[in-house]
């Protein structure tokens, strides 16, 4: 079965400053067999663009927080615009680009909210993230509000007010259903469910984002 793996801040070597600077993703790539850089999955019904928001080091004290730079944003937006008409367009990254109010921790992604709006302009339906260890689904404030920031829980024992969980995502022409599958001690069971109306503009050639033309917000980004 296809697997799509995104690197996160816990994949960075904690104690070795040299490894953080020069080879932060070596252990991740060796363990998963997947490259730790922006990449994508494409099929007729699904397009997933992965963006690395974790950094080996950065110019602030808390290196666990996220960053998405302008080049990453533009390249991901261009890839999203190339998705087949009608396909579910997903942007996957470790840190939430849109913060959940009341979450036990934050991603504090530099340029995160601006990037989320650019991705929505490019046709994204889901921005799928982790990091905060609790599941959520929030609309992105743009156009018809049918682009969503969706966070998943964690399979770690480091709980932050929610049981260990993962998200199961199902979709049809009209809705996306996100089910947080929580660990109850001996098995996973549905815990929270969000039924999200799908964007309809990306399902028609006449209204889908132009694959050859950047949107206004993307053009204006500096």
Place the predicted regions along the sequence by residue.
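Proline-centered loop/turn at the N-terminus of a beta-strand
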Residues: 2-5, 47, 88, 125-126, ...
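Short, structured patches in soluble enzyme cores that scaffold and shape functional sites
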Residues: 50-55, 93-95, 180-182
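Short, catalytically relevant binding-site loops at active-site mouths
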Residues: 55-57, 95-99, 133-135
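A short C-terminal boundary segment appended to hydrolase-like catalytic domains
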Residues: 171-222
């Amino acid at each position: 079965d296809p697997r799509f793996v995104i690197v996160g801040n816990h994949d960075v070597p904690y104690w070795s400053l040299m490894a953080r600077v020069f080879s932060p993703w070596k252990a991740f790539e060796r363990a998963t067999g997947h490259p730790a850089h922006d990449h994508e999955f494409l099929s007729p019904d699904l397009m997933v663009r992965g963006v690395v928001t974790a950094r080996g080091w950065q110019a602030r004290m808390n290196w666990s927080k996220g960053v998405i730079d302008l080049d990453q944003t533009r390249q991901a937006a261009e890839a999203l615009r190339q998705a087949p008409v009608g396909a579910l367009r997903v942007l996957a990254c470790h840190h939430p680009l849109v913060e959940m109010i009341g979450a036990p921790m934050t991603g504090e992604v530099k340029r995160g909210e601006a990037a989320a709006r650019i991705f929505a302009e490019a046709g994204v339906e889901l921005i799928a993230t982790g990091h905060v260890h609790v599941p959520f689904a929030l609309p992105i404030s743009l156009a018809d509000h049918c682009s969503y920031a969706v966070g998943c829980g964690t399979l770690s024992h480091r709980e932050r007010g929610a049981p260990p969980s993962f998200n199961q995502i199902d979709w049809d022409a009209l809705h996306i259903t996100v089910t947080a599958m929580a660990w109850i001690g001996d098995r996973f069971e549905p815990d929270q469910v969000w039924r999200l109306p799908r964007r309809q503009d990306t399902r028609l050639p006449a209204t889908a984002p132009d694959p050859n033309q950047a949107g206004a917000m993307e053009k204006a980004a500096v």
